[in-house]
C-alpha cells in the first residue's frame, strides 16, 4: 500500500505499488484484482475494480476504491487497518468488463452508481491516455453531490478527452446542474 486518500464520505482510494517499483501485470480498463484478506482466523478474498489507467501498471501502480459498508466484513477492516507500507496479496487482473473492438459498438453508454464507477474511471483514463478508441458516455448515479466518487478526476478527464462524457444523476438532493 503506497497511499490511502479519501474519495467521498465513505470511500477511500488505495494506491498499490510493487515492492521494487517493477511493472505490475498489464490490465485492460474494466478489469479487477482479488485481494486476500486475513482477518483474525478468517481468510477471504474480495474483488476490487482497477480505477487507474492501464498505463500506470507499467510504473508499478494499481488503484482501487473501497467503500465502507457498515454491515460489511472486509470493507471496514480495509478502511480501519490498512496503512501505507502494508504488504498485500492480490491476484493478477481478471474479468471481461472491458472494451473489445471486435465485440462492442464504437459508442458505449455505461451505467454506474456509487463506487461502481471504478471500472469506468479506468476506461475514461485509458481513453484520455490514447490506449482505447471509442466514445464513452457515463450515466453516473449518486445520492448526493458530496457522494460522487472521483468527481474531480471525472471532470478533468472529460475536459481533456472529447471521447468521454459524464452525466450525473442525484437521487437524494436536487441541485442545479444535476
Go through each PLM region and give its residues.
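FNR/FR-type flavoprotein reductase catalytic core
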Residues: 71-178
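Ferredoxin-reductase
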Residues: 1-87, 106, 142-144, 155-158, ...
Amino acid at each position: 500500500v503506497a497511499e490511502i486518500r479519501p474519495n467521498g464520505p465513505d470511500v477511500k482510494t488505495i494506491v498499490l505499488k510493487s515492492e521494487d517499483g517493477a511493472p505490475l501485470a498489464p490490465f485492460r480498463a474494466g478489469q479487477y484484482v482479488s485481494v486476500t484478506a486475513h482477518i483474525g482466523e478468517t481468510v477471504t478474498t474480495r474483488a476490487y475494480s482497477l480505477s487507474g489507467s492501464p498505463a500506470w501498471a507499467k510504473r508499478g501502480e494499481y488503484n482501487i476504491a473501497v467503500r465502507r459498508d457498515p454491515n460489511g466484513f472486509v470493507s471496514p477492516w480495509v478502511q480501519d487497518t490498512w496503512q501505507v507500507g502494508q504488504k498485500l496479496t492480490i491476484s493478477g487482473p481478471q474479468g471481461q468488463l472491458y472494451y473489445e473492438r471486435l465485440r462492442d459498438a464504437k459508442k458505449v453508454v455505461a451505467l454506474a452508481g456509487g463506487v461502481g464507477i471504478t471500472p469506468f474511471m479506468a476506461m475514461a483514463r485509458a481513453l484520455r491516455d490514447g490506449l482505447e478508441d471509442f466514445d464513452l458516455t457515463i450515466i453516473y448515479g449518486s445520492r448526493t453531490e458530496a457522494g460522487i466518487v472521483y468527481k474531480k478526476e471525472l471532470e478533468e478527464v472529460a475536459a481533456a478527452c472529447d471521447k468521454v462524457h459524464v452525466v450525473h444523476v442525484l437521487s437524494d438532493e436536487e441541485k442545479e446542474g444535476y
